[in-house]
C-alpha cells in the first residue's frame, strides 16, 4: 500500500488529491483546494508551501506527482504558476517525498485514454476510477487525476526497479 499525493499547482488555487495505491488499484483518501486569496505573491507562495506541508503531515504520502508548467499566452501567469509549483515541490522535498512531474497530456492519457480529453471527461474518469459519488472541485479533480497518473506510472516502473532507484535522488522526470 502506497499513499500518493497529486498536486495541480496554481498561484491562487492549488488542487490536491491523495490516493492509496493497493494491489487492487487506487482508492480515494482526500482531496481539496488550497486557496491563497489575493495577497502579495510571496504571501500566496507561503500559503501554498504551508498548505502542501500540512497535507503531507496529515496524510503521510511517500510520493508526489505534480503537473509540469505549460507555456501560457501570458508569460507573467506562467512564471507565477512555476513559482507555485516550486513552493509545492520544496514542501514535498523537505518531507522526503519522491517527486515526479507529468505534462497535462500525460495525465489525460493515463486517466481518460486520450491526451485530448477535456476537463469534464477527466473528472468523469476520476469519479469512475475512485468510485466517487459527488463531483470534486475542478482543481481537486485535476490533482486526483495527477495522483492516478503517478500511480499508473509507478505500477509500470516498479517491476523494472526504476521507481526506487531514483527515490533519494530528487525528481523523477517522465
UniProtKB/Swiss-Prot annotation:
Similarity comment: Belongs to the RuvC family.
Keyword Hydrolase annotated: yes
GO MF terms held by the record: crossover junction DNA endonuclease activity; DNA binding; magnesium ion binding
Gene3D superfamilies xrefs: Ribonuclease H-like superfamily/Ribonuclease H (3.30.420.10)
Broad class of the protein's primary localization: cytoplasm
GO cellular component, one term: Holliday junction resolvase complex
Coiled-coil ranges (or none): none
Cofactor dependence: Mg(2+)
Name the UniProt record assigns to this protein: Crossover junction endodeoxyribonuclease RuvC
Location within or outside the cell: Cytoplasm
Catalytic residues of the enzyme: 8, 67, 139
First-tier enzyme category under EC: hydrolase
Keyword list, A-Z: Cytoplasm, DNA damage, DNA recombination, DNA repair, DNA-binding, Endonuclease, Hydrolase, Magnesium, Metal-binding, Nuclease
Reactions catalysed, as given in the entry: Endonucleolytic cleavage at a junction such as a reciprocal single-stranded crossover between two homologous DNA duplexes (Holliday junction)
Free-text function comment from the UniProt entry: The RuvA-RuvB-RuvC complex processes Holliday junction (HJ) DNA during genetic recombination and DNA repair. Endonuclease that resolves HJ intermediates. Cleaves cruciform DNA by making single-stranded nicks across the HJ at symmetrical positions within the homologous arms, yielding a 5'-phosphate and a 3'-hydroxyl group; requires a central core of homology in the junction. The consensus cleavage sequence is 5'-(A/T)TT(C/G)-3'. Cleavage occurs on the 3'-side of the TT dinucleotide at the point of strand exchange.
InterPro entries noted in UniProt: RNaseH-like_sf (IPR012337), RNaseH_sf (IPR036397), X-over_junc_endoDNase_Mg_BS (IPR020563), X-over_junc_endoDNase_RuvC (IPR002176)
Residues annotated to bind Mg(2+) 1: 8, 139
GO term, biological process aspect, one: DNA recombination
EC number: 3.1.21.10
PROSITE patterns for this protein: RUVC
Positions that bind Mg(2+) 2: 67
Assembly behavior: Homodimer which binds Holliday junction (HJ) DNA. The HJ becomes 2-fold symmetrical on binding to RuvC with unstacked arms; it has a different conformation from HJ DNA in complex with RuvA. In the full resolvosome a probable DNA-RuvA(4)-RuvB(12)-RuvC(2) complex forms which resolves the HJ.
Cofactor note: Binds 2 Mg(2+) ion per subunit.
Amino acid at each position: 500500500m502506497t499513499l500518493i499525493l497529486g498536486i495541480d499547482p496554481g498561484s491562487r488555487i492549488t488542487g490536491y488529491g491523495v490516493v492509496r495505491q493497493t494491489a487492487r488499484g487506487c482508492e480515494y483518501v482526500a482531496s481539496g483546494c488550497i486557496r491563497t486569496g489575493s495577497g502579495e505573491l510571496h504571501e500566496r507562495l507561503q500559503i501554498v508551501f504551508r498548505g502542501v506541508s500540512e497535507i503531507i503531515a496529515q496524510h503521510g504520502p511517500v510520493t508526489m506527482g505534480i503537473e509540469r508548467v505549460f507555456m501560457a499566452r501570458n508569460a507573467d501567469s506562467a512564471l507565477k504558476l512555476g513559482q507555485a509549483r516550486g513552493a509545492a515541490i520544496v514542501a514535498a522535498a523537505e518531507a522526503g517525498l519522491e517527486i515526479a512531474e507529468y505534462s497535462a497530456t500525460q495525465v489525460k492519457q493515463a486517466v481518460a485514454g486520450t491526451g485530448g480529453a477535456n476537463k469534464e471527461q477527466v473528472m468523469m474518469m476520476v469519479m469512475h476510477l475512485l468510485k466517487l459519488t459527488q463531483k470534486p472541485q475542478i482543481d481537486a479533480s485535476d490533482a486526483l487525476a495527477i495522483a492516478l497518473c503517478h500511480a499508473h506510472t509507478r505500477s509500470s516502473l516498479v517491476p523494472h526497479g526504476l521507481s526506487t532507484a531514483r527515490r533519494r535522488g530528487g525528481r523523477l522526470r517522465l
